[in-house]
Amino acid sequence: MPELPEVEVTKQGVSPYLIDNRVTDLIIRNPSLRWPVPDIAKQIIGQTIRAVRRRAKYLLIDTDAGTTIVHLGMSGSLRILPINSPVEKHDHIDLVLASGKILRYNDPRRFGAWLWNELPEQAHPLLAKLGPEPLESAFNSSYLLSALANKKKAIKLCLMDNHIVVGVGNIYANEALFAAGIHPQAEAGKVDAERISILVAEVKQILARAIKQGGTTLKDFTNAEGKPGYFAQKLHVYGRGGDTCTHCGQLLSEIRLGQRATVFCSICQQR
């Protein structure tokens, strides 16, 4: 599943082609995504794209008339292509631009979203209750320590809770907890301030590094040019259950936590 770095890489890739460009058509070949794709051709055709933003794992394409909200789901991708590019399987939506380019949405599993919003952002149900961005200053050790106070849930589940902090999905939660030396099942409210400070720093560093290296390639992710990311080569624990720890040589343990694969080192990550 594309996580925050993959969506940020996508945003950086498509933005130069979209901003200040005029929409000339919207082609919806298959409206059956996670939610039905609304027929917004009348609203968006003729509009100039003013900004492209990311909020959590949502890509927001702003015009004066409203905002297109895109979520890549489990397997979605956005690519910039010439207007006459052949349509391939799972190419569900084209946003056609006056420049002669198209923004094409491809999604084999169709669990992503392409929605339209004319409300204030804080009033939209998908965006209203999101926590701070992990790469911004609002996400700091003081904030996280306060947010986790008295919480009995496992620290990994809290780290993946979008009400606490957005965009830290399974891959990067595994990696950040390993880097901080925190057991994923540790009770969140009992993790001390020093460890929380280290965890915040590791979340920021790991996400920033993944963005710089182009996102993580596991199965489906490609960037806006159709190229894979390369951060998978740098993963220490995610997807490596049963392999040896890169720090101590101990075999890595794998469990299910919140129905997600969780890999950790029982030596390096103490409760």
Curated annotation (Swiss-Prot):
<feature type="binding site">
    <location>
        <position position="109"/>
    </location>
    <ligand>
        <name>DNA</name>
    </ligand>
</feature>
<feature type="active site" description="Proton donor">
    <location>
        <position position="3"/>
    </location>
</feature>
<dbReference type="GO" id="GO:0003684">
    <property type="term" value="F:damaged DNA binding"/>
</dbReference>
<dbReference type="Pfam" id="PF01149">
    <property type="entry name" value="Fapy_DNA_glyco"/>
</dbReference>
<feature type="active site" description="Proton donor; for delta-elimination activity">
    <location>
        <position position="260"/>
    </location>
</feature>
<comment type="subunit">
    <text>Monomer.</text>
</comment>
<keyword id="KW-0234">DNA repair</keyword>
<keyword id="KW-0378">Hydrolase</keyword>
<dbReference type="InterPro" id="IPR020629">
    <property type="entry name" value="Formamido-pyr_DNA_Glyclase"/>
</dbReference>
<comment type="function">
    <text>Involved in base excision repair of DNA damaged by oxidation or by mutagenic agents. Acts as a DNA glycosylase that recognizes and removes damaged bases. Has a preference for oxidized purines, such as 7,8-dihydro-8-oxoguanine (8-oxoG). Has AP (apurinic/apyrimidinic) lyase activity and introduces nicks in the DNA strand. Cleaves the DNA backbone by beta-delta elimination to generate a single-strand break at the site of the removed base with both 3'- and 5'-phosphates.</text>
</comment>
<keyword id="KW-0479">Metal-binding</keyword>
<keyword id="KW-0326">Glycosidase</keyword>
<dbReference type="InterPro" id="IPR035937">
    <property type="entry name" value="MutM-like_N-ter"/>
</dbReference>
<keyword id="KW-0238">DNA-binding</keyword>
<protein>
    <recommendedName>
        <fullName>Formamidopyrimidine-DNA glycosylase</fullName>
        <ecNumber>3.2.2.23</ecNumber>
        <ecNumber>4.2.99.18</ecNumber>
    </recommendedName>
</protein>
<dbReference type="Pfam" id="PF06831">
    <property type="entry name" value="H2TH"/>
</dbReference>
<dbReference type="InterPro" id="IPR012319">
    <property type="entry name" value="FPG_cat"/>
</dbReference>
<keyword id="KW-0863">Zinc-finger</keyword>
<keyword id="KW-0862">Zinc</keyword>
<dbReference type="InterPro" id="IPR015887">
    <property type="entry name" value="DNA_glyclase_Znf_dom_DNA_BS"/>
</dbReference>
<dbReference type="InterPro" id="IPR010663">
    <property type="entry name" value="Znf_FPG/IleRS"/>
</dbReference>
<keyword id="KW-0456">Lyase</keyword>
<feature type="binding site">
    <location>
        <position position="151"/>
    </location>
    <ligand>
        <name>DNA</name>
    </ligand>
</feature>
<dbReference type="GO" id="GO:0140078">
    <property type="term" value="F:class I DNA-(apurinic or apyrimidinic site) endonuclease activity"/>
</dbReference>
<feature type="binding site">
    <location>
        <position position="90"/>
    </location>
    <ligand>
        <name>DNA</name>
    </ligand>
</feature>
<dbReference type="Pfam" id="PF06827">
    <property type="entry name" value="zf-FPG_IleRS"/>
</dbReference>
<dbReference type="InterPro" id="IPR010979">
    <property type="entry name" value="Ribosomal_uS13-like_H2TH"/>
</dbReference>
<comment type="similarity">
    <text>Belongs to the FPG family.</text>
</comment>
<dbReference type="InterPro" id="IPR015886">
    <property type="entry name" value="DNA_glyclase/AP_lyase_DNA-bd"/>
</dbReference>
<dbReference type="GO" id="GO:0006284">
    <property type="term" value="P:base-excision repair"/>
</dbReference>
<feature type="active site" description="Schiff-base intermediate with DNA">
    <location>
        <position position="2"/>
    </location>
</feature>
<feature type="active site" description="Proton donor; for beta-elimination activity">
    <location>
        <position position="57"/>
    </location>
</feature>
<dbReference type="InterPro" id="IPR000214">
    <property type="entry name" value="Znf_DNA_glyclase/AP_lyase"/>
</dbReference>
<dbReference type="GO" id="GO:0034039">
    <property type="term" value="F:8-oxo-7,8-dihydroguanine DNA N-glycosylase activity"/>
</dbReference>
<keyword id="KW-0227">DNA damage</keyword>
<dbReference type="GO" id="GO:0008270">
    <property type="term" value="F:zinc ion binding"/>
</dbReference>
<keyword id="KW-0511">Multifunctional enzyme</keyword>
<feature type="zinc finger region" description="FPG-type">
    <location>
        <begin position="236"/>
        <end position="270"/>
    </location>
</feature>
